[in-house]
Amino acid sequence: MVMTDPIADMLTRIRNANMVRHEKLEVPASKIKKEIAELLKREGFIRDVEYIEDNKQGILRIFLKYGANNERVITGLKRISKPGLRVYAKADEVPRVLNGLGIALLSTSKGVMTDKDARQLQTGGEVVAYVW
């Protein structure tokens, strides 16, 4: 079966595993998914990510992060730019998520980055998702 939006599938898998407090999940790997997972790790939303080689495209194993009382670190994930409706932001229009409490993931010509990084580099791009 052909998947029309693999990034939305990855975000949905993370959201679902987070809701039932799973420790880890696996998603089919791709370059952009790997970059998104590394960004989520760097920003402290997930504990770890590892790439597992297989004879197809590879697998990303994502380890979710929870607080001291087992509260969720990720409270929300939302896909913004979709295959049917792409959303782009210029350098001076990069969105803020919850007044800086969350992050916006942008796909730019310089790679996938957060809204904060895009503002520092004065670059715009496709608004992939919001995470808070």
Swiss-Prot record:
PROSITE patterns: RIBOSOMAL_S8 (PS00053). One of its GO terms (cellular component) is ribonucleoprotein complex. Pfam families: Ribosomal_S8. Keywords: Ribonucleoprotein, Ribosomal protein, RNA-binding, rRNA-binding. Gene3D superfamilies: 3.30.1370.30, 3.30.1490.10. Part of the 30S ribosomal subunit. Contacts proteins S5 and S12. This is Small ribosomal subunit protein uS8. It comes from Bacillus cytotoxicus (strain DSM 22905 / CIP 110041 / 391-98 / NVH 391-98).
